Amino acid sequence: MQNVSEREREEMGIVVNYLFSHNFLLKEFEREKYHLAVRNKDIIKQYLQVIGWDFIVDEKHGCIVIVSPHYEHRLKLKKDETIWLLVLRLIYEEKRSALSISQYPFTTLQEIKGKYETFRLPFVSKTKLRELVQIGKQNQLLRPIDNDIESDDCRFQLFHSCIHVLQQGDLNVLYEKIKSYSEGGDHSEMDEETTIN
C-alpha cells in the first residue's frame, strides 16, 4: 500500500464499500470504479483476504464480485424468486453462446413465460413480476428495455453478473434444478453458491 497515493486509497475505499453494498461491480454501470478496481486488484484482493472474502475479477465479462467465506451476505430468496433467477440464468446460458463476449443477451417476457410453461410452472402474478424485476435491477442482473414490464413483448437485457449469482453454469444442472421445483421441490432459499447481496 506504500506506492498507492492518498487519492487512490480514498477511491479504493469507495470501490470496496460499493462492492460490500452491491456485491457486483459491472463495467457497464460503473466504468471508473471498475477500471480503478482492475488496476489495483492485487491490493484490493489482499485487503479482502484479511477478512476472509474472495475478490473475483472477471475481466472477460466486465464483472467484479466479492464473496464472503460462508456466503453469509447472500439474500435468502423465496421459492418463486429462486425459480425466476434460475429461469433467467438458463435463458442467459442458452443465448450467450451465440454472442460475442462484449454483447449482453436479451430476452422477452414472453420467452420467460415460455420457460415456465416448459417446466409446467405457474407464472407469477403482476405484482410479483414487478417485485422480481426490481430484484433483478437492484442486483444488476437485468435491465428492462421497454416501459411496460407486464407486456409479453417487453425486452430485458441480461448482464454477465448472472454467471456469478448461480454458479451452476452447466445447462443440464440448471434444467434439473428448475425441474425439481416443477416436481414439488420445496426449497425455501437458494443454494450455498448464491451470492446476491
UniProtKB/Swiss-Prot annotation:
Disruption phenotype: When this gene is missing the Wadjet system does not confer plasmid-transformation resistance in B.subtilis. It comes from the Bacteria. Transmembrane segments: none annotated. Pfam families: DUF4194. Component of antiplasmid transformation system Wadjet type I, composed of JetA, JetB, JetC and JetD. Expression of Wadjet type I in B.subtilis (strain BEST7003) reduces the transformation efficiency of plasmid pHCMC05. This is Wadjet protein JetB. It comes from Bacillus cereus (strain Q1). The lineage of its organism: Bacteria, Bacillati, Bacillota, Bacilli, Bacillales.
